[in-house]
């Protein structure tokens, strides 16, 4: 029985670009899946990937927040016929192979339902690239609820949790592929009624599955509201990842979240943002909170760009130190 956590192990922080990016590549994040409220020793911790459970020790270098593909058409129009799975496979596989060639072993795929999540495609890519890919359950309410299915508005938090737990126990979309975490999205705080409901549903799913909650949070106020809801639900903050925390300008909120035990994720790392990310990470280190930090790129392939066969933002080349848009050699 175990509670899922990201474990971040890192050497002393370096401040120039090359060293910082090397540090990022060396960061190992372990997403431990299971159920209950007790952590297993690291030797027995396991992670749910699209190909099944693996020991956490096999994660290796991990990108904790990336996307293979996104479709921004909205929940009402989202359907598989909008893209050809084999074309996406051929376009994305070289980037995953490049990540593997430079030492990467695991990619946490954060695309939720109704925005382009395709778990069978992910399993095919995982098998071909020999990478561990981790998918999710949950709903994304950010962007003004555009990506929420109709039933999310009328159902209770418990009813939403029932759907997400069905993914965990029985598999996603009539497959045997199970989620390794919960992904939700909320707009800037204060939380709306429906976004509060999403957080409660995630908390109740976590209570019964142990899956960690990764929350796209519109700002720091939203993240603080989410943490308050988790407190009301009796959830340990170590089960919560504040996604896109770098967008919050009040850096004291980063400290407040981390001091409560939450994970603070600085993503969108690329050549244009690395200096600012260095500053954020240094501050967390100065406050002895580096162990609560996650770093990723939030790379993605946008479905609308598929015909051009060039990702809008690729899964980045870790060695290059920037968000590459060129194809791998």
Regions found by a protein language model. Give the residues of each.
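Short acidic/histidine-rich active-site segments
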Residues: 214, 267-269, 290-310
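Active-site gating/metal-coordination segments in enzymes
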Residues: 124-127, 132-212, 263, 268-271
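N-terminal secretory signal peptides
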Residues: 1-16
């Amino acid at each position: 029985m175990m509670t899922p956590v990201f474990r971040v192990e890192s050497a002393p922080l370096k401040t120039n670009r090359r060293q910082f990016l090397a540090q990022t590549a060396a960061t190992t994040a372990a997403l431990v899946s299971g159920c209950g409220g007790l952590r297993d020793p690291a030797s027995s911790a396991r992670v749910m990937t699209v190909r099944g459970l693996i020991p956490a020790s096999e994660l290796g270098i991990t990108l904790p927040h990336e996307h293979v593909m996104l479709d921004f058409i909205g929940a009402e129009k989202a359907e598989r016929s909008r893209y050809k799975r084999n074309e996406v496979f051929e376009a994305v596989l070289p980037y995953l192979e490049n990540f593997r060639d430079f030492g990467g072993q695991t990619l946490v795929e954060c695309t939720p339902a109704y925005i382009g999540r395709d778990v069978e495609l992910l399993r095919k890519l995982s098998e071909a690239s020999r990478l561990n890919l981790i998918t999710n359950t949950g709903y994304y309410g950010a962007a003004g609820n555009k990506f929420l299915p109709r039933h999310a508005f009328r159902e209770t938090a418990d009813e939403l949790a029932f759907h997400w737990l069905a993914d965990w126990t029985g598999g996603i979309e009539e497959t045997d592929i199970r989620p390794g975490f919960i992904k939700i999205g909320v707009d800037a705080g204060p939380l709306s009624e429906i976004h509060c409901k999403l957080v409660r549903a995630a908390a109740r799913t976590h209570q019964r599955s142990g899956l960690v909650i990764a929350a796209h949070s519109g700002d720091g106020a939203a993240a603080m509201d989410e943490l308050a809801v988790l407190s009301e639900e009796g959830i340990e903050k170590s089960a919560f990842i504040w996604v896109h925390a770098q967008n919050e300008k009040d850096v004291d909120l980063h400290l407040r979240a981390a001091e409560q035990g939450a994970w603070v994720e600085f993503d969108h790392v690329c050549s244009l943002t690395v200096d600012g990310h260095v500053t954020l990470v240094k501050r967390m280190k100065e406050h002895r909170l580096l162990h609560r930090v996650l770093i990723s790129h939030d790379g993605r392939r946008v479905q609308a760009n598929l015909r051009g066969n060039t990702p809008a933002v690729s899964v980045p080349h870790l060695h290059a130190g920037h968000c590459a848009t060129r194809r791998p050699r």
